[in-house]
Amino acid sequence: MTSPPHTLEAETGPDPVASIIVMHGLGADGSDFAPFVAEIDLRPIGPVRWLFPNAPQQPVTINGGYVMPAWFDIRHDRGDEDEAGLRRSQAAIEALLAHEKARGMPAHRIVLGGFSQGCAMALLTGLRHTERLAGIVGMSGYLPLAGTLAAERSAANADVPIFLAHGTQDEMVALPRATASRDALQALGYGVDWHAYPMGHSVCMEEVGDLRGWLLNVLAP
């Protein structure tokens, strides 16, 4: 049985009413998005549990085989996706979702999100999850294994709210790849809240503000 990844946690108060999972990008770790706890004020909905899972250490082909935190391998040919690695991490995130539900947080109060590789994992896992989630957040990433989604997607999350954000000058995941992912999701009937910002492969405060508003909406009691 797959174990959940080692995960950093922060609760903004006792008895949290929602859980927000944020997965980091290539070469980072769970602490990368810990500032969200202070930057995104969700007090209007009540206490929240933030979870920041750590990707496993593995060689990354496009970086010369250097071992670093990665949810999956990235090869030189963008079309050659590491399906085995993606599926392994999908299973680990499913285990994390199961752990959250086992300690009393219903799926409809869980937001699954991530940045770059973490965005890919949020879309891969969330759209196939068998129980309705509160929402999916994708920052500066793309839709992986897009060709399998129509057959594998979960009816429970057919109408899940999706927040997608991207930098117009992103040098790591080019904007057209992100807009193609958005268009593919919309073609399958998903409702996508799309945001583009004048930045590179990063997060800006305007984006954080927009994300806060979106979270307050999808997690409203």
Predicted regions and their residues:
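Primarily recognizes the serine-hydrolase "nucleophile elbow" in alpha/beta-hydrolase
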Residues: 106-157
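Short beta-strand/loop motif that positions the catalytic acidic residue
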Residues: 164-166, 170
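Short, conserved loop/helix-junction motifs that constitute active-site signature segments
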Residues: 42-45, 153-159
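C-terminal catalytic histidine-bearing segment of alpha/beta-hydrolase fold enzymes
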Residues: 176-221
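Short alpha-helix in the alpha/beta-hydrolase fold that links the catalytic acid
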Residues: 33-38, 150, 174-184
